[in-house]
Structure formats: structure tokens, C-alpha cells
């Protein structure tokens, strides 16, 4: 978000907008975390090693997203990236519950990790810009 764009809105409104995105991100993750046993049972995965490999795709996606998120935030701005990444994060969460194959689940978990980290990076970038504007003005 550019500094000029921020000043067009009241400071409290800006703070609450960013806070609401952090809240939405936390709700998405807690929704997934509470459903892990159900998803495991849905796919009849009883091998702990195999299930661990499937779940490991989340941090792999997060790792892959680090350079991608930095590039996109610098190109498009944190405001657009927050909106796009929250949408992708919620969509991947929906798809986790809708897939019928363990391989599709793995792909959804990978993209869940990608959008989760893109959301983290763009939200924190947005938060830094807002914090600086609130302190210096």
C-alpha cells in the first residue's frame, strides 16, 4: 500500500482492516487444524509415515512461496497481494475438504502452504507500512 493511499482513510479504519485480515488468516488455519483427524479418516490413512509426508507438503509450499511472495509484493504491492492471497488461502482450504484423492489432497495442502505464506508476508509488509505511517504522522 502506498503512503498516499493510506492517508485517504482514517487511521483506525486502516488498523482494523489489517487486523481483520490477520483474524481471517488465523481462522482459516484453525479450521484446517481442527479437521486434520477427519481428513485423515476420510482418506483411510493409517500409516503415520505416509500421513506425515502428505502433511509435509504444507511447509514445502510455505518454503516455495518465500521468493514468490517477495517478488509479487514488490511488483503488485502488499494491498493487492493481501487480497489475492487471502482468497487463495480460503479457496485452498475449501478444496482440501472437497477432494477425493490423496494426491489431490497433497496438491491442495501444497497450495495451502503457498497461500498461507504469501498471506503472511504480504500482511506483515502491509502492517509495517501502516505502523510507519501511524508513527510518523
State the predicted function of each range.
Residues 11-35, 110:
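Pair of pore-lining "gating" transmembrane helices in MFS-fold secondary transporters
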Residues 34-48:
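Short amphipathic helix-loop junctions that connect adjacent transmembrane helices
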Residues 53-70:
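Central cavity-lining transmembrane alpha-helices of secondary-active solute carriers
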Residues 67-89, 93-96:
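Conserved MFS/SLC helix-loop-helix module at the cytosolic interface between two early adjacent transmembrane helices
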Residues 98-103:
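Helix-breaking motifs and short loop linkers at transmembrane-helix boundaries and internal kinks
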Residues 104-119:
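Hydrophobic core of transmembrane alpha-helices in multi-pass small-molecule transporters
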Residues 118-131:
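Intracellular juxtamembrane helix-capping segments at the cytosolic ends
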Residues 135-137:
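Conserved small/polar residues in nucleotide/adenosyl-binding loops
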Amino acid at each position: 500500500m502506498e503512503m498516499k493511499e493510506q492517508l485517504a482513510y482514517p487511521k483506525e479504519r486502516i488498523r482494523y482492516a489489517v487486523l481483520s485480515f490477520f483474524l481471517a488468516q488465523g481462522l482459516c488455519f484453525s479450521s484446517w487444524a481442527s479437521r486434520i483427524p477427519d481428513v485423515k479418516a476420510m482418506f483411510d490413512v493409517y500409516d503415520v509415515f505416509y500421513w506425515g509426508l502428505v502433511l509435509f507438503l504444507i511447509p514445502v509450499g510455505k518454503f516455495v512461496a518465500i521468493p514468490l511472495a517477495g517478488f509479487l509484493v514488490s511488483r503488485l504491492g502488499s494491498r493487492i497481494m493481501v487480497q489475492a492471497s487471502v482468497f487463495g488461502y480460503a479457496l485452498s482450504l475449501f478444496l482440501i475438504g472437497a477432494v477425493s484423492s490423496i494426491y489431490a489432497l497433497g496438491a491442495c495442502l501444497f497450495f495451502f502452504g503457498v497461500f498461507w505464506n504469501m498471506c503472511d508476508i504480504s500482511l506483515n509488509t502491509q502492517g509495517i507500512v501502516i505502523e510507519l505511517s501511524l508513527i510518523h504522522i
